[in-house]
A protein has these predicted regions:
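Short, well-formed alpha-helical segments that are part of the catalytic scaffolds
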Residues: 15-29
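Acidic helix N-cap motif at the loop->helix transition within catalytic regions
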Residues: 19-21, 46-54
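Conserved donor NDP-sugar-binding/catalytic core segment of glycosyltransferases
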Residues: 98-129
Length: 258
């Protein structure tokens, strides 16, 4: 029997109390109501938990130990019950109240594809600029410069887990994910608002910590994750090799990848 829940929205959070209500409310106001919200809080020290507990519809998971972005998303994935998974960072939000309906309509009209590529608006200061992500084949998707997991809506049964406690976990997961995707369609209008104004974003804080002295060991772990990745499709394997060559060259030259 098909799962009653259609979308699982997974949100990792760490100390994002300033933006969290906007992120949550952008989901709760959706006209399409068949979804679940899973927030994985990664040991926040602000009032994030207090904010989250005000909302009855949210499934809150509190990490006992730091899991970082990759680990938090994996925890959420293990609890997800929807047919499709959407990722959202806790300082970003959905563009308008019709986003879920647009994604759902695209899925139904295209015979339930494995993946839906989501375009977005980039917010810097008070200005939003539209970023179109037309990626209608796995070959185009895997070679995309922008690999953020929140730019893809994926069938739950095909979701690949993220490397944990490492740099560039989105990249490794992206390649592994593309290797499992056969059908993909794109939505050429904004679905997500990517907020570039948050100086306390999880990814930015993790990058700052790496720059303080842990970048080299994280680069080695990133390279190891790429080496361990096994790809069935040649286009994914070629992209894996290219990414690996870049990181190995940067390690050799002492360069930090951001």
């Amino acid at each position: 029997m098909l799962n009653d829940i259609f979308f699982s929205v997974i949100i990792p959070n760490y100390n994002n109390s300033e933006w969290l209500p906007k992120s949550i409310n952008s989901i709760l106001k959706q006209t399409f109501s068949n979804y679940e919200i899973i927030i994985v809080d990664d040991c926040s020290t602000d009032n994030s938990i207090e904010i989250i507990k005000k909302y009855d519809k949210i499934k809150l998971i509190q990490c006992k130990n730091k899991a970082f972005n990759g680990g938090s998303r994996n925890i959420g994935l293990k609890k997800a019950q929807g047919q499709y998974v959407l990722f959202l960072d806790s300082d970003d939000w959905f563009y308008d109240e019709n986003c879920f309906q647009k994604i759902y309509n695209t899925i139904i009209e295209n015979n339930k594809p494995d993946c839906i590529s989501l375009s977005y608006n980039c917010l810097i200061g008070n200005n939003q600029s539209f970023q179109s992500l037309i990626r209608n084949t796995p070959q185009i998707l895997v070679s995309s410069v922008f690999v953020a997991c929140w730019t893809k809506c994926i069938k739950k049964e095909l979701i690949q887990f993220f490397p944990e406690n490492t740099l560039m976990e989105d990249v490794v997961q992206h390649i592994a994910q593309c290797d499992k995707i056969n059908t993909i369609v794109s939505i050429n209008e904004p679905i997500i608002v990517w907020n570039r104004n948050n100086i306390n974003s999880c990814s930015r804080i993790e990058n700052q910590n790496l720059q303080k002295g842990k970048w080299q060991s994280s680069m080695y772990r990133y390279a190891a994750d790429l080496m361990d990745l096994e790809c069935e499709h040649s286009y994914c394997e070629e992209h894996r090799k290219w990414r690996l060559s870049v990181v190995l060259n940067n390690i050799k030259e002492g360069k930090y990848i951001q």
